[in-house]
Swiss-Prot record:
Active-site annotation: E106
Family of this protein: Belongs to the glycosyl hydrolase 23 family.
Disulfide partners: C40-C93, C54-C62
EC number(s) recorded for this UniProt protein: 3.2.1.-
Protein name per the record: Lysozyme g-like protein 2
Sorted UniProt keywords: Disulfide bond, Glycosidase, Hydrolase, Secreted, Signal
Organism field: Mus musculus (Mouse)
Gene giving rise to this polypeptide: Lyg2
Function: May act as a potent antibacterial protein that may play a role in the innate immunity.
GO cellular component, one term: extracellular region
Gene Ontology MF: a single term: lysozyme activity
Signal peptide, first to last residue: 1-19
Entries under InterPro entries matching the protein: Glyco_hydro_23 (IPR002152), Lysozyme-like_dom_sf (IPR023346)
Length: 213
């Protein structure tokens, strides 16, 4: 009788310990599960977005559906960079899905680049740093270069927080995305945020969040 009691006691103890460990890992280290990790700049899954802009010449491939369609088209090209994107995202405390979304919009996962450059020779790398605004380092799809690009993005978001402390988290993130592309001086009021850019990026980011980024 005693051995049986001891056996079931050990089973209960192991089960309890395992459950506590799983809970503590997920609650203390959000990096474990991609859907729980959103970094230091807000949860993109809660942010409103309208997707890619619609106009008279683009009524079929616009809105959230259009953004998700383009994100899915780029998924195969971006998947090989998933581990790198996650590592860089966690290094800079920003959602990897947001990085993937920018890469999708700017370079389609590098598929349209020529030796890392756009067709005009003005923008470089997966996130397409403008050589007139920045000084790109490293090879176009290297960890070194992606760290630089994401570092610039997060600095722009932090600058928005300092410049506009009364803005909400979503506005500061969207302002940072706009400033990454256009420069800090272009943002004076929330109306200066590039809605076409940020709505498309956020819709793509939500897609990538649901696909393991």
């Amino acid at each position: 009788m005693v051995p049986s009691v001891v056996f079931w006691g050990l089973i209960a103890l192991v089960g309890t310990a395992k459950g506590s460990y799983t809970h503590s890992v997920h609650s203390m280290n959000p990096h474990v599960h991609p859907r729980l990790y959103h970094g230091c700049y807000g949860d993109i899954m809660t942010m409103e977005t309208f997707g890619a802009p619609c106009d008279i010449n683009n009524l079929m491939n616009c809105g959230i559906h259009g953004s998700e369609m383009f994100a899915e088209m780029d998924l195969k090209a971006i998947k090989p960079y998933r581990i790198l994107i996650k590592e860089v995202g966690q290094r800079h405390c920003i959602d990897p899905a947001l990085i993937a979304a920018i890469i999708s919009r700017e370079s389609h996962g590098g598929a349209v680049l020529q030796n890392g450059w756009d067709h005009k020779g003005q923008r470089f790398g997966l996130m397409q740093l403008d050589k007139n605004m920045y000084h790109p380092i490293g090879s176009w799809d290297s960890k070194e270069h992606l760290l630089q690009s994401v570092g610039i993005l997060t600095e722009r978001i932090k600058a928005m927080k300092r410049k506009f402390p009364t803005w909400n988290t979503a506005q500061q993130l969207k302002g940072g995305l706009t400033a990454f592309k256009s420069g800090m001086e272009t943002i004076v009021t929330p109306a200066d945020i590039d809605g076409d850019l940020v709505d498309d990026v956020l819709a793509r980011a939500k897609f990538y969040k649901r696909h393991g980024f």
